Amino acid sequence: TLDKFVKNNNGGYKHLSLNYVEDYSNFANLTYPQFFTNDDGDVFMYMREGGASNGAYKFSKYDATTSSWSNFTHFNVRNAGNQSVITYNWGLYGNMKYVNGKSRIGFQRRSSNQNDKYRYQNGVYYAYSDDQSGASGWKNHSGESFSLPLYDADFVKVMEPGDYVQTTQSNQVHIVGDFD
C-alpha cells in the first residue's frame, strides 16, 4: 500500500536513490521496478534503464543488516552497438526472477534496426545463474558461461519464432502479445 512508501521532498514518490544519497546518473532513467527474493530470503530489485530499443536491466540486493542496497549489477548495457561486434543497440522486454534455486531472466529483444522485418521486439532469450546473488555464474540455455554485462543478446538466444514467417519486408512480423 502507498503508506509503505516514502515521499520525496516534493511530496511525490520519485527517488534518485536507494540509500539516501541522491545519485542522478544511476537513477534518472530507471523504469518498471520489480522485486523478488531468493531461497535465503534476500530481497532483490531490478529495473530497466533507458528506452525501447536501447535499454538494459540492472539489479540490486538489499542488505538487512546495514539497511542498504548494493551497487547495481548490470545484466546488459545500453549502447551495446558501440561494441565492435554489435551492429545495433537493443533493449529487452521480459522478466527477472528467482525460481528453483536460480536467478533467471527471459526476454524478447527490441533492436534499433528500423529496417528489419520485426515490428517491436523479437526472439526468445534466456539466461540463468546458479549464484543466489546473481552476481556471477551466468549461463545461456545451453549451459555456456558468460560474464556480466551481456553485450551480445544472440549469445542467450533460444529461438526466433519470426523465422517461420516468410517475409523480408520491414515491420511485418508482430510477436509481442502476452510474452511476459
Q: Where on the chain are the PLM-derived regions?
A:
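Extracellular, repeat-based ectodomains that mediate carbohydrate processing or recognition
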Residues: 1-180
